[in-house]
Amino acid sequence: MTVTKRDGRKVKFDRSKIVKAITKAFVEVYPDELPADTYTFCAKIADDIEARKQDLTVEEIQDIVVRKLMASKYKDVATQYVQYRYQHELIRQSNTTDKTIKELLDGENEYWKTENSNKNPKVVTTQRDYIAGVTSTDITRRFLLPKDIVKAHDEGIIHFHDADYYAQLSLHNCELINLQDMLQNGTVINGVQIDKPHRLITAATISTQIITAVTSSSYGGATINLSHLAPFVRDSREWHRRKYLSRGISDGEADSWAMEDTQKEIADAVQTFNYQVNSMTNTNGQAPFLSVFMYLNDDPEHQEETALLIEEFLRQRILGFKNESGHYITPAFPKLLYVLDENNITEESPYWYLTVLAAQCTAKRLVPDYISAKIMRRDKVDANGNGNVYGCMGCRSFLTPYLDAEGKPKYWGRFNQGVVTINLPDVALSSGGDMTKFWELLDERLELCHRALQCRHERLALATADVAPILWRYGALARLPKGAPIHPLLHDGYSTLSLGYAGLY
């Protein structure tokens, strides 16, 4: 006979523990003198449980003890036993994180060394994030999630992602940052008004500050659109041109020298951007989990400027970054998303040279990732019947097509609320080869996933714009008034919830 403990371990039944626990309850009720039959009575209950010869959980054994005490003349002992059981449950619940946090701080558990390859658990900023995450997970499991969802997660039936960021109301998963709105219309970071920049080098620096602030207010990956920086390339070129014209330089020479200066500024801006993203640490204890979307046709008016930015990003990624030893390495971020379209997929196309450069970058640095505009337009069709091309979020999932109130496509400034994954192989194994049972189990577990996702949605729906102003008030995701609920942004397709699956290839 085995007993399943609360942590899932199976141990051999030990009758002496039953006798000891019941005897403690007798001692509390009869402190001066125990009834003469105390030990034989306790032993009889233990014998009855052992005689069942079936595997039980700790909770099932305790329930049997309570029923037998209540059926005897010792109902007062039953009451004391229930109180004892409840007090110990409170003790267990109030002390669930100490061991985990100690293992993290002392480096005793291999889990923390491999939990996230982008985080170093020896660094204090990462440890601070992990400690907060341990606390959030503990609160989530004990108070916030339904017990059957916690149980399904523990058993591997489903996976409830990111419980370490669930306790707070405002934290969502991934997003497409509306950099265009924030740069063109200004934004506010930590109470400081940031107006529209007038040169690329300034826009690039502000962008990294925005990225750090946004990724500190969410827990997934963020994506920006490189074409949102393209207008500032033109602004810089005009700035340099005016500089030379003011010195009496001819138009032709001014244009030539301005372009030369602009090329240098592009290189400096991209280098600044890359070093800022990789050297800054957000409140998640890591560099911002960022992707850069590189699509030539997103802003046709600034296609040439977008091409210049793409080229420089690829060249600098091929070069790599120096590590602390001075050797060039492949940086983790930003990830690059390169879109293949009609004007860059054949040798005759005008931007074929960029695709060649992207391939060289892939060969050396394993980036960029490639997106087919043709397939996107086929699969991402909006209510107007038009196909759309846009970036995936940092987590590599795509938003669904969406039209705003004016009937225009809207992607940048949208987000994902959270993720739950179903374990499909477990559904198959649990069905035992019975297809009818398989579909029944699949329906049951999908409904469990639906409820888990609904928990995510309802938790986020309690937030107001003030909990993360950079997101909800100052343009990254919305321009809501102070104190306004974010609830409307969680409905009608503006944001998404993701159902993942594990086990299919």
Language-model segments: residues:
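Conserved catalytic cores of very large enzyme subunits
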Residues: 87-91, 97-494
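Extended amphipathic alpha-helical segments enriched in small hydrophobics
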Residues: 499-505
